[in-house]
Design a protein with these regions (language model features):
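A gly/proline- and charged-residue-enriched helix-loop-helix capping module
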Residues: 1-11
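N-terminal secretory/targeting leader peptides
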Residues: 10, 14-227
Length: 227
């Protein structure tokens, strides 16, 4: 977080105030047959998969799929018409947007949490008095904690609502859940290290950037980025 705060200030002239996230990003596929109960990540090879970010696109290409950028509002007709075979989005947003009407399976590989942030113009922040800064810091920290708790709750709700329920938001979606196997987890680690992280490190561009990632997120995740 300290590294992000520094980059916000130096690159964008902004004060980072909050980091929060949307529900976990997962795969939703139209496999055509709900009797399918297992589906390894290796079978995604050749599939057209909706994405919305470079990093997720790297993952899709890493498993042999074809990344297709489609606006969220256009995903349902794209899945319905076969423009895409699968889509990536948050597990509760997928339910709310009725993806369950056009897909059969939810592959429960968590590919991140669509991180978001709240920031303020740094000059404006620096112009505030100490009491106002303290007010923002306290209440935004409280709000951030509440939002992370809400994300966890929404993950739980989305997991149930997309499958057989019970669903507090309406009709259960009836998707067939695909639970990652040990083989899938090994595939995921390989793809992250050899596609996602390698390409990210190249975009990041400096050894300092890569080293800072390795010293923070890398230590927690047990993975290492390299240029």
């Amino acid at each position: 977080r300290d590294i992000l705060a520094r980059e916000f200030e130096q690159k964008y002239g902004a004060k980072l105030l909050m980091i929060y996230a949307w529900p976990s990003q997962q795969l939703f596929c139209n496999l055509g047959d709900k009797s399918i109960k297992s589906y390894p990540l290796s079978k995604l090879k050749g599939k057209k998969i909706r994405t919305y970010s470079t990093t997720l696109g790297d993952f899709i290409e890493g498993v042999g799929g074809s990344a297709v950028t489609i606006a969220f509002a256009e995903v349902v007709p794209a899945l319905q018409k076969g423009v895409a075979d699968c889509g990536l989005t948050g597990i509760l947003p997928a339910y709310n947007a009725k993806w369950w009407q056009v897909v059969t399976h939810n592959i429960r590989v968590k590919l991140g949490y669509a991180s978001s942030f709240l920031a303020m113009n740094l000059k404006v922040w620096n112009g505030l008095d100490s009491d106002t800064k303290a007010f923002f810091n306290k209440h935004l920290a409280d709000l951030e904690e509440e939002m992370w708790a809400a994300t966890a709750k929404n993950d739980e709700i989305g997991t149930k609502c997309n499958a057989a329920g019970p669903c507090p938001k309406g009709e259960p979606g009836g998707m067939v859940p695909i639970i990652p196997t040990a083989e899938d987890k090994a595939t995921l680690k390989n793809v992250v290290e050899n596609f996602v992280l390698k390409r990210w490190a190249k975009r990041c561009g400096t050894q300092k950037c890569v080293d800072e990632w390795n010293e923070t997120i890398g230590k927690i995740s047990g993975m290492k980025a390299s240029l």
